[in-house]
């Protein structure tokens, strides 16, 4: 299905709005701190919507479509393994609270303060290389999504030359994201990502109701029941033939989520942007509510497409989808484009335009954030540490913009030439492991263990990156391209002939192995180094090192996780109440409203986790019929829909309040040209190199 003029008008309006806002935000960007971290002025609602959009991305939508198309509702069941982990990480402020206390603008700046300058440079190089390789496929996947969804031709003729449509679509999307980023840096990114986030939330709800009008709930279930018995889209305990996205996948991902929490620097500007550590913590907590509407998109849209492709009454639409897919030679790209192509057959004019605009918004919000992050990391953590003298503000901003432009050029070229040979999620994991393999140990150890040493950091990061690169080479180069020839050349080699046709480990499994090895080496080499304990109060700006602009009382180890100062002398009731809040992670910075949000979040996530545990026990011991599972999924969708609608309205109000506060604060803020992410010699806590 091709787009109607109404659809193009909707897309054009969105693009004009984004560019207009970006030009207006340029006047607010007056310093390096503005460009890198929004001058640390963002509130919770602004953060949770903008950062959520930065992490969404058209490529993430495509990856989720792959996952839920293959595993169906059952993927949501195993995904509940992640629920308590996300809850604990968000509610405790794990990593993000202490990281914000360090006042570092990039993670590698924290590495220099905590470990050494040489390690900062090494970690910055790894983060940059891992990041641009990971980001390198974004433009291509996004462009293909738009091409097949909008029904654009695969090739176009320009001056007699036949060119793939992929290139101009990628160029357009990258140019748009680049314009937003270069104009206003992190300030423009926060503002435009927030507005795009609100737009996406609304479009998701509209899309859900329109699709439900096309395919009823009963028809949806009928279509899902046509899946093979051992690849059920309804019953999570009948998935013996499901490819990749099974229980083992989610268990490993659960561990990696803890290990690498906030370690990935694709949106590093948001880590430094909160106005206080408490606002950063609340933004993470509110993310659960924001995610409800996104869950509707990720889970239900691919299931509607699955039903359409299997129900006889949609045979015409299914034939059109299959005809388009048959023209795609690469089997992995064919898998990725099945759902986008199917969605184009289900939505009417107008809604098609809204959905296309949503995909473009998701793409731009991720592109501008990643361009900003990897370009900034290259300058701040690779180039700047080599300089003996700081750059002027103007030269520093110019260098940042040049680096960001360079990242965009690399992504464009890489997307044109790299042949993606596995699921998007798997590629994310293994390319991310080049940096994340060791970074999780280095970050958590650096923030929470005073005996973590620079030797342990070097060991974890070095070994982790080597193992990850080895995994990428084995799976994507040696196994598919060299192993078949080796088997032909050495037919008598038994061990060579015994090797499987495909590499036995996927990207997630390899990432898990890398993380375990890195943790072991961080602990081992830190203990062997026998360095004196690090001054954690100085690192975290506590007690005599407290910084006034946090706008709160100095934090101690007890108050960080919620020690409310009510003692026995204040009465047994107050003492018990204080102990209760302490145990669930509430501190003095929480208002009554914050506490209500916090408790609801705990209750909501706990309900679904215990339902998962009890349901799994019943399914294994007694068994649950498909009819029982269908009732559960109906209940889940209804609850998700209610929260999705409510949170969209709630965050619309709170987000615009934060947006106006941000603009007001930036207009009156005093800029400090020395606040540029550099580290002075007296700030080093270990080596003075």
Task: Write out the residue ranges for each language-model feature.
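Transmembrane helix-loop boundary segments of multi-pass membrane transporters
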Residues: 2-3, 7, 66-81, 140-167, ...
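Selective recognition of specific alpha-helical transmembrane segments in multi-pass small-molecule
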Residues: 10, 89, 126-138, 199-213, ...
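Hydrophobic alpha-helical segments and their helix-loop junctions in multi-pass secondary transporters
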Residues: 21-28, 131-139, 143-155, 165-168, ...
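Membrane-interface helix-loop-helix modules in multi-pass membrane proteins
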Residues: 36-104, 244-261, 267-313, 324-330, ...
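Helix-loop-helix module between adjacent transmembrane segments
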Residues: 53, 76-182, 252-260, 269, ...
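Loop-to-transmembrane helix boundary motifs in multi-pass membrane proteins
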Residues: 113-121, 132, 162-168, 373-422, ...
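Extracellular/periplasmic helix-exit of transmembrane alpha-helices
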Residues: 210-226, 288-338, 416-420, 477-489
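Terminal cytosolic tails of multi-pass membrane transporters
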Residues: 478-633, 645, 654-689
